[in-house]
Amino acid sequence: MTAVRAPRRRASGDVQGGFDFSRPDEIVCGVDEAGRGPLAGPVVAAAVILDPAQPIDGLDDSKVLSAKKRDALYDLIVTRSHAYCVASASVDEIDTLNILHATMLAMKRAVEGLSVLPTLAQIDGNRCPTLSVRAEAIVSGDALVPSISAASILAKVTRDRMLVDLHERFPVYGFNVHAGYGTAKHLAALREHGPCEAHRRSFAPVRAALDLIR
């Protein structure tokens, strides 16, 4: 599937929230993920259909927002959206399928878990999961399409909270600080303690740490 390179501006005109008023039968959801790159924890995806009657100011790519701003927007999104769903693929699924296919699986679960069936799913990035509804990939969609921005925020906040919970179980790795990414301190902890069950053994730094303790 060819990815859509959207113009560097927010959608406007007849498209508001998840509804295209030039086509009353069109219901659009935005989809994004968080956690493809980390060495530990699940990959999380979210799908959001915004409600044009309850606009949300400040939506943007979750990566450019502060944690405080993301948390505030998270509360608004789950309260004001027409529908939303957050789903994940586990570490075992990542290691079995690979991270790309696990990400597609999490996205598929998020779209299929919506309480309202969309007619179009707009996916951040350059490829789409196999869905029962039409889908289009939008490069940099998390910075361009409000519903994708909302999905990126839900996915990021949810995953960060999951990693805080993992920190309670495995405090030596500092998951609450780096969310599983391969920081210098995380890599040092991997070398010292070896991987835990939350680490992705299909990722090279984790395999290298395993080799050290064999």
From Swiss-Prot:
Top-tier EC class: hydrolase
SUPFAM superfamilies, per the entry: Ribonuclease H-like (SSF53098)
Record keywords, A-Z: Cytoplasm, Endonuclease, Hydrolase, Manganese, Metal-binding, Nuclease
Cited InterPro entries: RNase_HII, RNase_HII/HIII, RNase_HII/HIII_dom, RNaseH-like_sf, RNaseH_sf
Localization terms from the record: Cytoplasm
Superkingdom classification of source: Bacteria
Protein name (Swiss-Prot/TrEMBL): Ribonuclease HII
